[in-house]
């Protein structure tokens, strides 16, 4: 079973029901709703279609809603057609409402002219185009094109090294967050996080809206790297957002930061997603480059929970093939993990947390190793015990059994966890029989096979943070 998960961004290329079903069948475990594009109404339909496709395939699905954040973007272009910016040409960014061309384009950031100085660098489209500021008026920033290229509509604008007086949560983000809670999203991602306080504010808004969604902090600013440990503590998960991170810092530092972010997330038992340009060439080509295949494999070896596809599945020519290709690369990477990569339990050993649940997870993982068990089954109401076990990266199959469909969907994004839904049980004996029946019917365990069985805190069932070795078809243990 593939352990690292695949998060696919939905868009025009992948929103049709037949394509969505093929996307999930090819290996997507979760879908991303990018609030930078489209309307709430369109995304409501996208979520409904994704849930329906998952239901037809009888599998869980995580839905991650990615808030736009205070992204500075270029505006529209004449006729919606891309323009070519030539090196050494003069190009103007303006707050005036204009249909852009090769001489000027509008921006959604009213404070741009105020916040730049002559000589400052401005990067467009994830750094593909570089400008240098020559002068500014109240509305216009006049620049010289250093590195030209093709500019399409609504592309990102980055000001490397600049600290802009912009809140992490915009008014649009607040509306979209409330919408995401109403739609039953499984995760909410916050863009352009700079400090832990940004995460705490977003989490308070989720709670106020009546939600319990885990918050994923997107690490894409230099300030976020400076405050990484505090952000990891405050957030429920992290995303290595390499596009903006590479232009806000420098491209050669992205691999260094990626490893550091993943390591910090693993240490704190937080889900972590590696994103941006993983199979970029498959937007237009049916095969990835060798470098892209190596990139995906290295993210897996670094310890990421999930790898993400962006334009590859949202607007590319080969959305389903991109997912299938990524799944094959992950399979190969996991089968051929080098000795230098993290080594499961040994990698996490010795990190004392003081938590009983952590100790039980380590005990279960070591017990499974000692008796050569193939499966660790986790009975969980909240998903917490399963997530903690996952953070140890055991070799064994992790099977989470939960009565809560929301928990089942949430765990679909977490490394190595296979989830099964079950009806609520009234007592310990009924729960044990349910576990055995589920494992056998799913083809996970056979008669007389010994599995490691864990239970989180399930009030009223006599199961409380426990571990037992259980032989399928054998006598039920009297007490866990």
Spans of features found by a protein language model:
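Non-catalytic helical/linker scaffolds that mediate oligomerization, partner binding
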Residues: 1-480
């Amino acid at each position: 079973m593939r352990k690292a998960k695949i998060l696919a961004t939905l868009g025009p290329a992948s929103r049709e029901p037949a394509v969505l079903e093929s996307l999930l069948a090819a290996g997507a475990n979760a879908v991303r709703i990018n609030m930078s594009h489209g309307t709430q109404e369109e995304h409501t339909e996208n979520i409904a279609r994704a849930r329906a496709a998952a239901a037809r395939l009888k599998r869980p699905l995580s839905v991650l809603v990615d808030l736009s954040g205070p992204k500075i973007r270029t505006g529209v272009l004449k006729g919606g057609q891309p323009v070519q910016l030539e090196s050494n040409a003069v190009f103007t960014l303006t707050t005036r409402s204009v249909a852009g061309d090769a001489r000027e384009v509008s921006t959604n950031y009213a404070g741009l002219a105020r916040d730049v100085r002559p000589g400052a660098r401005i990067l467009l489209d994830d750094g593909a185009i570089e400008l240098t500021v020559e002068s500014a008026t109240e509305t216009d920033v006049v620049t010289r094109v250093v590195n030209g290229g093709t500019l399409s509509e609504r592309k990102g604008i980055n000001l490397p090294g600049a600290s802009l007086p912009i809140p992490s949560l915009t008014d649009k983000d607040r509306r979209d967050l409330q919408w995401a809670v109403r739609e039953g999203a499984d995760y909410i991602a916050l863009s352009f996080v700079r400090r832990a306080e940004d995460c705490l504010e977003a989490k308070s808004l989720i709670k106020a809206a009546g939600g319990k969604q885990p918050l994923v902090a997107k690490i894409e600013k230099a300030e976020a790297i400076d405050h990484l440990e505090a952000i990891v503590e405050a957030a429920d998960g992290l995303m290595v957002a390499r596009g903006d991170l590479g232009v806000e810092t420098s491209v050669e530092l992205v691999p260094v930061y990626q490893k550091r972010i993943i390591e910090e997330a693993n240490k704190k038992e937080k889900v972590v997603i590696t994103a941006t340009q993983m199979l970029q060439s498959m937007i237009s080509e049916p095969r990835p480059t060798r470098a892209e295949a190596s990139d995906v494999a290295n993210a897996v070896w670094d310890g990421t929970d999930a790898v993400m596809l962006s334009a590859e599945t949202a607007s590319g020519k080969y959305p389903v093939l991109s997912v299938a290709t990524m799944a094959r690369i992950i399979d190969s990477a996991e089968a051929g993990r080098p000795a230098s990569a993290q080594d499961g339990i040994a990698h996490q050993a010795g990190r004392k947390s003081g938590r009983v649940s952590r100790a039980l997870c380590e005990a279960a993982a070591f017990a499974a190793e000692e008796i050569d068990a193939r499966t660790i089954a986790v009975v969980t109401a909240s998903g917490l015990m399963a997530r903690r076990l996952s953070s140890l990266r055991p070799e064994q199959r992790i099977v989470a059994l939960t009565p809560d469909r929301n928990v089942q969907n949430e765990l679909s994004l977490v490394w190595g966890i296979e989830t099964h839904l079950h009806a609520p049980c009234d007592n310990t004996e009924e729960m044990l029989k349910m576990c055995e029946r589920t494992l056998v019917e799913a083809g996970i365990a056979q008669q007389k096979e010994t599995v490691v069985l864990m239970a989180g805190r399930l009030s009223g069932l006599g199961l409380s943070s426990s571990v037992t070795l259980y032989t399928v078809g054998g006598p039920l243990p009297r007490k866990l």
